[in-house]
Amino acid sequence: MTNRVVLAYSGGLDTSVAIPYLSKMTGGEVVAVSLDLGQGGEDMESVRQRALDCGAVESIVIDAKDEFAEEYCLPTIKANGMYMKQYPLVSAISRPLIVKHLVQAAKEHGGTHVSHGCTGKGNDQVRFEVGFMDLDPSLEIIAPARDYAWTRDKAIEFAEENNVPIEQSAASPFSIDQNVWGRAIETGFLEDLWNPPTKDLYAYTEDPALGNAPDEVIITFKSGKPVAIDGRPVTMLEAIEELNRRGGAQGVGRLDMVEDRLVGIKSREIYEAPGAIILITAHEAMEDVTIERELARYKRGIDARWSEEVYDGLWFGPLKRSLDAFIESTQEHVTGDIRLVLHAGKVTVNGRRSGSSLYDFNLATYDTGDTFDQTAAKGFVQLHGLSSKIANKRDREAGEN
């Protein structure tokens, strides 16, 4: 049986050269699979044709934008997914979807191997390979950049020696990954933590200091899902795209952080994720109004753990599935409208309304109409502080002795 390698194909230098390289190394054929996740840029038909020109026996392009928005971005919103309380999992949530389609392509096209272009220093090698192991452990995995010390210089040399039809543009000093959920930039001069990011790094967001007029937006949620913007019904994909445009124009969603990678090193990362930041901010505000205090407290811990599981490449794992079930059970009443102002790089919530609200005006007001029974408060305070009072009494007495 002839080996067939199913390659996660981006259209760039490394994966273009990987096609003849993998064919030569395995003595088999290469099937290139590319996903449109709303990353923009080059036309996907050009990407498909380039893979064929480089020697792929088949080149498959999948429009996965809606699937990505509905099945990967939406769960991230419901989980308020932020790794280290900052990063909205831009790349992390795209990898399991790519894995899913590569495994499916291997089944449909007789694949015996799968391949990716990740290095040995990053998180993505883990996300891809654990995903392959979870969905089809029979597939053999090849990672040229990691396993064969594949560098850009080696890729160019191999292309020249083997007449691979690629254009050699000036090498960017940065590593960039993007999709509709956001954009990630790393390496280059950013590796010096003292160097500030330059304006040319950004593509999804304008300079927050431009002074554009504030933009007020109302996001409507139904059971945790954004369903309308300013009263207009939207799909999940449309919601992200519109808020990317509007938030990006205000410089919303820029992040500069030092991230704890799964492989044990710290890495400086720049992110642009206007739509993601706006939607998660609005969703958290909707939860504040509609979820009971103890459940909300507990969910914050679950949200953080969910984000870590996804970041660590365990999208298909049993813990993440169980966390999904818990999170989904909390969303029944997360319904209503959140009004926000987008301006000068900030997202500010300034209005909330919900038919499922737990906010009771008559209990909260300090004015006429207050229905809160303040006479019950004294006894509550005594009981609430009783255990702490007893412990402190003991400690004082112990100190005296």
From Swiss-Prot:
Mostly located where? cytoplasm
Q: Which domain of life is it from?
A: Bacteria
Report the top EC class in one word.
Answer: ligase
State the Gene Ontology BP annotations: argininosuccinate metabolic process; L-arginine biosynthetic process; urea cycle
Q: In which pathway does it act?
A: Amino-acid biosynthesis; L-arginine biosynthesis; L-arginine from L-ornithine and carbamoyl phosphate: step 2/3
Catalysed reactions, as listed in the record? L-citrulline + L-aspartate + ATP = 2-(N(omega)-L-arginino)succinate + AMP + diphosphate + H(+)
The answer, when asked if Ligase is one of the entry's keywords, is yes
Assembly with partners or alone:
Homotetramer.
Task: Spell out the protein name for this chain.
Answer: Argininosuccinate synthase
